[in-house]
From Swiss-Prot:
Positions carrying Phosphothreonine: 197-198
Xref: InterPro entries: Ashwin
Pfam families in alphabetical order: Ashwin
Name this protein carries in UniProt: Ashwin
GO terms for biological process, alphabetical: embryonic morphogenesis; tRNA splicing, via endonucleolytic cleavage and ligation
Localisation per UniProt entry: Nucleus
Modified residues (Phosphoserine): 112, 143, 182, 184, 189, 193
Family to which the UniProt record says this protein belongs: Belongs to the ashwin family.
Chain intervals with Basic and acidic residues compositional bias: 116-127, 163-179
This protein's UniProt keywords: Nucleus, Phosphoprotein
Gene Ontology cellular component annotations, sorted alphabetically: cytoplasm; nucleoplasm; nucleus; tRNA-splicing ligase complex
Length: 232
């Protein structure tokens, strides 16, 4: 059973709370189902039927209790029940607001990836990798060797004839360069070492005469005298 109230559809439960909207026949039927005796005078008048319906058949807690000892006792029980319901609602709301404390251990993960915690984890991070230390030592050795003389070690896999020709050509080029730059005196070329046993020195040392000639070409700079300031 449904109806329209003020242009709004109402369900059966809403209509039961408003007996003035119900028909007289429906009120009589509900009262008879509740086994409530209805007099003939009350059946004719709808207002009396609605009052009887509100007093006995309307759904709780809208029912008006009688003003006797039993009615007062029921009102007290109703108030206590309402207070308990309010406390329960407030407790449930507080429980929903307070979020549980989530503790993540790492062991409760469902993934297959597991991180192992080591005792010296921080120290291991600070240590350089073994390759870095090896390369640093190699760079130091190379820098020390290149600062003095850079040796060129020839591979022994090449034929001997090619090695000797290459060494002779290098010696001739060095000899020609020294004669062009310093015609005043001959320059001793470094002795050639046997092939395959010792490295060949390709770096040519600067002659002493060239250094002296370069110093002579520089104009002599007169030393400036420092003039002391004297006050009268």
């Amino acid at each position: 059973m449904a109806g329209d109230v003020g242009g709004r559809s109402c369900t059966d439960s809403e209509l039961l709370l408003h007996p003035e909207l119900l028909s007289q026949e429906f009120l009589l039927l509900t009262l008879e189902q509740k086994n409530i005796a209805v007099e003939t005078d009350v059946r004719v008048n709808k207002d009396s039927l609605t009052d009887l319906y509100v007093q006995h058949a309307i759904p709780l807690p809208q029912r008006d209790l009688p003003k006797n000892r039993w009615g007062k006792m029921m009102e007290k029980k109703r108030e206590q029940h309402e207070i308990k319901n309010e406390t329960k609602r407030s407790s449930t709301v507080d429980g929903l607001r307070k979020r549980p404390l989530i503790v993540f251990d790492g062991s409760s993960t469902s993934t297959s990836i597991k991180v192992k915690k080591t005792e010296n984890g921080d120290n291991d991070r600070l240590k350089p990798p073994p390759q870095a230390s090896f390369t640093s030592n190699a760079f130091r050795k190379l820098s020390n060797s290149s600062s003095s003389v850079s040796p060129l070690i020839l591979s022994s896999n090449l034929p001997v004839n090619n090695k000797t020709e290459h060494n002779n050509n290098d010696a001739k080029q060095n000899h020609d360069l020294t004669h062009r730059k310093s015609p005043s005196g001959p320059v001793k070329s470094p002795p050639l070492s046997p092939v395959g046993t010792t490295p060949v020195k390709l770096k040519r040392a600067a002659p002493k005469e060239e250094a002296e000639a370069m110093n002579n070409l520089k104009p002599p700079q007169a030393k400036r005298k420092i003039q002391h300031v004297t006050w009268p």
